[in-house]
Every structure is written in C-alpha cells, then in structure tokens.
C-alpha cells in the first residue's frame, strides 16, 4: 500500500498494514489490522468486531471524512448508531466558492416531478436510465443517469463537457439524502463540540505512539504477530494514560 511517508515522492508501494483504533475518552477500546489501505472499507468490520468484543452497541460513531460513504452511513443506521461522520467533499461543498461553480450539477436546478435538470445554458437534461454499481465490499449503488441532448452548438459546451455524446449527470438519491442528513446533524452546536473533541482524542493515540514513542514500523511479520505487537503498544498507552489521569486527580 502507499504510505504517508514517501521520501522518493513517487507514490511507491510498500508492504504494510492499516491499523484501525477505536477510542473513548482518550482510551483505546478496540483495534483491528487490515491489508486494505482504504479506511472507508474497514469501518463496518472494525465496528462489528469491537462491538462483539465489548458486547455493546455504540449509540454514536464519530469518524473523519475518510470514512464517509453511502455504504457506511447505511451500515451505521442499520446498526442503530448515530453517525457523526463527514463525507469527503463536506468542507468543499460548504464553501461559498462551491456555489459559484455553475458547471457542477449539484448547483443546477432540478425538477423532481419531470426528473430533469436545467443546465447553465438553460437546456433540459432529462433522465435516461438507472444503473447499479457494486463496490469491492459487495454493496450496490443505485444511480440515475441524465443526459443533455442540446449540447451540439452550445456556446458553453467547452466549459461544461468534453464528452462527444454531450453532458451526462449521475444522481444518487440515497447519497444526496444521506449528505443532507449529515449536514443537518453536524450543524447542531452539541455535535460541533463533539467533533472538536474527536479531533483531539483520536489523534492523541497515534500521536503518542508514532510521535512521542517513535514507533514508525512493526518489528514482526504476519497479521497475527502484528496484531499482538500493536495490542501491547495500545495496552501500554492505556496504562500510561490511566496513570496520568490518576496523578491529575491527586494534584487537583
């Protein structure tokens, strides 16, 4: 997999493991090792494993934008967990500059009854067909396709599309509804405070292990051996964390 540390700056592939750690109040409460570099695909498995070990279902799951996807939002809803998880374009889409991008179909007028968009040139972009796409995890996306039939001779075509057949638009109703729900949820003041706390708590675990303890690579090979090594590291982290909190209580 590709590492964050890339001295040659050429995106070279290196053998490695994707470590997922769940934490609560700065303590590590569960971890998993994956050969998959994509954090997004690890969330359901990681949550299931930690819940099974703890015999507890999480009422709320908080994660960064690397975990936000249609599949994960649906999984968390099915799990009975409130998702405080941003999606990849969350911050970008909330900027004023994003609303000014007239060629982005998310800024176009949409007629739900007629099932058609209106493009920047004022032309209709009607519904054509529905297709499905399957992820590596076997999850199926349902996507509606729209296509403009008035691109020929349009003065805005060069800025709008380079496709020979004209501008096409993909619309995923479930994904749009999920993003709207996420936006509304994250706009609540109490949830803003929780998200700020998340950035501190989650980064503390890896910050301590990688930054302060200078642990940058595993000393063993094989998933099971790596699982033991990271488990010992996290156990040590939790013990030190508990001792620090006890000392702070005594000092207070």
Q: What spans do the regions from the language model cover?
A:
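Anion-binding and metal-coordination hotspots
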Residues: 1-252
